[in-house]
UniProtKB/Swiss-Prot annotation:
EC number: 2.8.1.13
The protein's name: tRNA-specific 2-thiouridylase MnmA
Family named by the database record: Belongs to the MnmA/TRMU family.
Record's catalysed reaction(s): S-sulfanyl-L-cysteinyl-[protein] + uridine(34) in tRNA + AH2 + ATP = 2-thiouridine(34) in tRNA + L-cysteinyl-[protein] + A + AMP + diphosphate + H(+)
Designated gene of the protein: mnmA
Subcellular locations according to the entry: Cytoplasm
Keywords: ATP-binding, Cytoplasm, Disulfide bond, Nucleotide-binding, RNA-binding, Transferase, tRNA processing, tRNA-binding
Length: 362
């Protein structure tokens, strides 16, 4: 089988490519250039996709003895990921750019190009598992629950899964690092990237401010009482507690959280933890890993990248998905993905459009 190994320059993608070589496949390494002005880690950047990352990927390919190329996808990435990121924040939503990159870049633009060039599959270093079930391929959580990335892969459809390979799905991260060291890969001890790759300093608010400009407005409580001001509602996300800079302290002394962001009125609504609870949500643009459900579905729903999944009933209603949680949950932000699970299996996903807030005291 001809396999295109997407190599970021990190330990995970390097070991994933190595395992494909060991399996006897014809492997070609490709590093994705996501920016027209590649940066250096020496500039203080902590994310991925720097010049050093490209060099690390090439060195790993050399150790493995496989051909290596750099593919320029910067313009597509700018349009489909960065511009989408900015547009979502401008509308008061909180997007997940890693999920969008998987959906529109790695398993769309890159996969399409790979298939056109005669490759059979794209291999990545994601921690997730693909298994064949009675109705086709199934996407499952990884064996390493701390590293599981099935949430950001929940946008993949059955045709995309047919051409995806995740060799690390059954491994622990500690095992992957040990294997990299044993193979003589220089990236064995390279730190993981935790930042949004196009915001390497981690300052999302500054990035948004520099691209969207100042848009001052009020911070109010759920009754409409003014508590403070801001210079851009897009800097806030539902569930946020830090950095609110309230000019008027809450009369009860309890912490305040962001409940709602309204870019049209430039208003940020804050409230107590109890007011943050929601009983359900409406999702749009559903994507199913298999056949869509024809009846209400009992499952668990993960509604943010690093959160637990909550029991819920999911019902497909035309082009939307209705989710009713079995118990109120907190921190559900429009723009994020709701990913539906049956135990470890990913059933599908949808983008959170609206939430239903619980009555205080419920």
């Amino acid at each position: 089988m001809r396999v295109l190994a997407a190599m970021s320059g990190g330990v995970d993608s390097s070991v994933a490519a190595a395992r494909m070589v060991d399996a006897g496949h014809e492997v070609v390494g490709v590093h994705l250039a996501l920016s027209s002005t590649p940066r250096s880690h020496r500039e203080g950047a902590r994310g991925c996709c720097s010049l050093e990352d490209a060099r690390d990927a090439r060195r790993a390919a050399d150790v493995l003895g496989i051909p290596f190329y750099v593919w320029d996808v910067a313009e597509r990435f700018r349009q489909d990921v960065i511009e989408d990121f900015l547009a979502e924040y401008a509308q008061g939503r909180t997007p997940n750019p890693c999920l969008r990159c998987n959906e529109r870049i790695k398993f769309a633009a890159v996969l399409d190009r790979a298939l056109a060039l005669g490759f059979d599959a794209v291999c990545t270093g994601h921690y997730a598992r693909i298994q064949r079930g009675p109705q086709g391929l199934e996407l499952h959580r990884a064996a390493d629950s701390a590293k599981d990335q099935s949430y950001v892969l929940g946008v993949l459809s059955q045709p995309q899964l047919e051409h995806a390979l995740f060799p690390l799905g059954d491994s622990l991260k500690t095992e992957v690092r040990a294997e990299a060291a044993a193979r003589g890969l220089a990236v064995a001890d390279k730190p993981d990237s935790h930042d949004i790759c196009f915001i390497p300093d981690g300052d999302t608010a500054d990035f948004l401010r520099s691209h969207l400009g100042a848009a001052p407005g009020d911070i109010v409580d759920s009754s409409g009482r003014r508590l403070g001001s801001h210079d851009g509602a897009y800097q806030f996300t539902v569930g946020q507690r830090r950095g609110l800079r309230l000019g008027t302290p809450a009369p009860d002394g309890r912490p305040r959280y962001v409940l709602e962001v309204s870019p049209v009125t430039r208003t940020v609504v804050v409230g107590t933890a109890d007011e943050l609870s929601v009983t359900g949500l409406t999702g749009v643009r559903p994507i199913w890993c298999g056949p869509p459900p024809d009846a209400p579905l009992e499952c668990t729903v993960q509604y943010r990248a690093h959160g637990a999944a909550a029991p819920a009933v999911v019902e497909l209603r035309g082009d939307e998905v209705d989710v009713e949680f079995r118990a109120p949950v907190r921190g559900v932000a429009p723009g994020q993905a709701a990913v539906f699970y049956a135990d470890t299996r990913v059933l599908g996903s949808a983008t959170i459009a609206r939430t239903r807030r619980a009555a205080v005291g419920s």
